[in-house]
Amino acid sequence: MAFLILVTLALASAHYSGEHFEGEKVFRVNVEDENHINLLHTLASTTQIDFWKPDSVTQIKPHSTADFRVKAEDILTVEDFLKQNELHYEVLINNLRLVLEGQFGRQVPATGHSYEKYNRWETIEAWTQQVTSENPDLISRRSIGTTFEGRTIYLLKVGKAGQNKPAIFMDCGFHAREWISPAFWQWFVREXIRTYGQEIHMTELLDKLDFYVLPVGNIDGYVYTWTKNRMWRKTRSTQVGTNCVGTDPTRNFDAGWCKIGASRNPCDETYCGPAAESEKETKALANFIRSNLSSIKAYLTIHSYSQMMLYPYSYDYKLTENNAELNALAKATVKELATLHGTKYTYGPGATTIYPAAGGSDDWAYDQGIKYSFTFELRDKGRYGFALPESQISPTCEETLLAIKHLARYVLQHLY
């Protein structure tokens, strides 16, 4: 038994060490003009770089910053290039391995589900069954499809049983490495269960609304971040003619598909796929929403990082018909979020606020007629990026819950 425990601990320690990222750094470069953008294009064409923000070198804009991860063997080359071309930069993360190890509160993550820890998919899957069986009056679970690798895509419905209730659809985990996203929706479900019948606002919301919650949108990719590559972003689909794996699910919806801010190269992180809704994961979500359009009044998709609340459009610079309303609602929502911990969010249309990107689920949902459609980019602003430590799960989820409740109350008061 002692030997088994030691082996288990050793395996866990090896997995969570982030050893593949030893010596890797994350840089932030100040981008002032088109010349700086061209220089970063040159750098990206000669060196393997993982862009964190924006998603791709093609989305860098003047008067902004670019965050990217560099492998240990390329660091000297990159630093020399930045210095020689007088590009001002800072190192956000000096050794990614250490930051990844530091994500966890202790060396070996807790067994079983925890709302204040990052959970493996197998744990989340079991949790969905448990919360459903323990709270049948508030929660039900259904399958809406399977992933490329054959995993069941579960959807939770949270709300007091009732006929013809309006609904809000909420998803997370479409980008596999954004672990704080699935952590939030688990927190949301917990708070709904815990405070129903005790806290007036949550009780009213669950009495009058249904919340469709997709715990992890990109399950295959999420599993891969736990078993092979913590920084994986895309799905895990394969196709004929390339050895490169995966499609960016947030470039795969039929909303200006592959028109701007997306790539047709299967090896790129923003690959839009061979066709709109080519991915089983995006198709499952789209089919469910299409089948329930009459009841779904808002669509929310949760990502990280950069502390932003975005609304359509991202595939075009045009404004929505209800832009003024969406802007006012976003302003009020991020103000509510900031009341707890003082966390500041930027808000606005996706294309102008962050960068243009076609094929996003929020734009697609809006074009389906869901006029309250938003993307949340949770903490932080780059100190940890995708490696947000578990110590920040609670404050992140607490403040985001305030925002979601505020937005949901508005939707309830403005049904259409």
UniProtKB/Swiss-Prot annotation:
Summarize where substrate binds, as residue positions.
H175, A176, R177, E178, R233, T250, R251, S304, Y305, Y355
EC number(s) for this protein?
A: 3.4.17.2
Q: Cofactor comment in the record?
A: Binds 1 zinc ion per subunit.
* GO MF: metallocarboxypeptidase activity; zinc ion binding
Cystine pairings recorded for this chain: C244-C267, C258-C272
Specify the enzyme's EC class, one word.
hydrolase
Q: Which UniProt keywords apply?
A: Carboxypeptidase, Cytoplasmic vesicle, Disulfide bond, Hydrolase, Metal-binding, Metalloprotease, Protease, Secreted, Signal, Zinc, Zymogen
Co-factor requirement: Zn(2+)
Single GO BP term: proteolysis
A GO cellular component annotation in the UniProt record: extracellular space
Q: Outline the extent of the Peptidase M14 domain.
A: 117-411
Q: Taking the first listed entry, what is the main subcellular location of this protein, grouped into a coarse class?
A: secreted
Q: Where in the cell is it found?
A: Secreted; Zymogen granule lumen
Q: Which residues bind Zn(2+)?
A: H175, E178, H303
Pfam family for this entry, one: Peptidase_M14
| Extent of the signal sequence | 1-15
Active-site positions on this chain: E377
Q: Could you tell me which InterPro entries the record lists for this protein?
A: CPB_M14_CPD, M14A-like_propep, M14A_act_pep, Peptidase_M14
Positions of the pro-segment in this chain:
16-109
Reaction equations catalysed: Preferential release of a C-terminal lysine or arginine amino acid
Q: Indicate the family of this protein.
A: Belongs to the peptidase M14 family.
Instruction: Tell me the protein's name.
Output: Carboxypeptidase B
From what organism does this protein derive?
Answer: Canis lupus familiaris
Gene designation per UniProt: CPB1
